[in-house]
């Protein structure tokens, strides 16, 4: 439902909405996150899709782009180089999409050699070693998610067939209790929020939930900080 907002953002930035109309001076328009797992609806408007987890792959892409700026490469040559180097980057302009008669995708073919096919989703192996923003901007006004949010586990053990995230975020990767406590204390010290949300696709499946809650209560009850579970299965 937010696809039109993406186009509006590009237009407000005074960047040509159609990727094919962007010239040498235009910035790259990159999309990622959960919705990028199905990129074709936005393929005409996005230069590069970063498929999968971005904590490690996005900084790598940025460093490659910075290095290319020192070379005399055209915009298209840079896109080709990124798509050939990073196995989780999808550049729609470099692929041909073949459809069945019912408009479902039959095949995605690279237009040039050296491109990954299929494109693999990036996956962070250890959440404890990835960057986590512990100094988020605190708004002047009250927002809907007016709290600290910490992802305690990525992936889900349930395997519900209807759930995109549960199927695409495999395998399950939990943070350690120590890492969660450390992040919670840093975020609290930097924001002063009075609520901490422990986020996961199914928080009740976190393997060390009892010990985590004991530690969180010990540290944060004296500070009058609430702990919330935003995703609980109804049968648990």
PLM ranges: what are they?
Residues 92, 98, 102-149:
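N-terminal [4Fe-4S]-dependent radical SAM core
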Residues 1-110:
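Glycine-rich beta-alpha loop elements in corrinoid/cobalamin-binding modules
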Residues 186-236:
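Conserved SAM/AdoMet-binding glycine-rich loop
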Residues 47, 156, 160, 180, ...:
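Conserved, mostly hydrophobic/aromatic
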Residues 138-161, 188:
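N-terminal pre-triad scaffold of radical SAM enzymes
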Residues 86, 127, 145-149, 157, ...:
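Active-site lining segments that contact anionic ligands and/or coordinate catalytic metals
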Residues 163-179:
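Iron-sulfur (Fe-S) cluster-binding segments and ferredoxin-like electron-carrier domains
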Residues 31, 51, 165, 198-200, ...:
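Conserved beta-strand positions
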């Amino acid at each position: 439902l937010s696809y039109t907002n993406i186009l509006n953002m590009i237009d407000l930035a005074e960047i040509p909405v159609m990727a094919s109309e962007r010239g040498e001076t235009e910035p790259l328009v990159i999309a990622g996150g959960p919705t990028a797992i199905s990129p074709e609806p936005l393929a005409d408007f996005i230069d590069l899709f970063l498929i999968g987890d971005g904590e490690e792959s996005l900084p790598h892409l940025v460093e490659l782009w910075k290095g290319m700026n020192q070379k005399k490469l055209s915009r298209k040559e840079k896109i080709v180089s990124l798509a050939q180097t990073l196995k989780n980057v999808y550049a729609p302009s470099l692929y041909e999409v073949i459809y069945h008669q019912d408009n479902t995708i039959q095949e995605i073919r690279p237009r040039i050699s050296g491109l990954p096919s299929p494109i693999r989703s990036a996956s962070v192996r250890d959440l404890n070693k990835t960057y986590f923003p512990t100094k988020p901007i605190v708004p002047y006004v009250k927002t809907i998610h007016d709290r600290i949010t910490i992802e305690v586990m990525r992936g889900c053990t349930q395997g519900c067939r209807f759930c995109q995230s549960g199927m695409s975020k495999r395998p399950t990767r939990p943070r350690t209790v120590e890492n969660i406590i450390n992040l919670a204390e840093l975020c609290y010290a930097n924001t002063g929020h009075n609520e901490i949300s422990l986020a996961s696709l199914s928080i009740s499946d976190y393997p060390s939930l009892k010990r985590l809650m004991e530690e969180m209560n010990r540290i944060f009850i004296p500070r009058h900080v609430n702990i919330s579970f935003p995703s609980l299965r109804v049968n648990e």
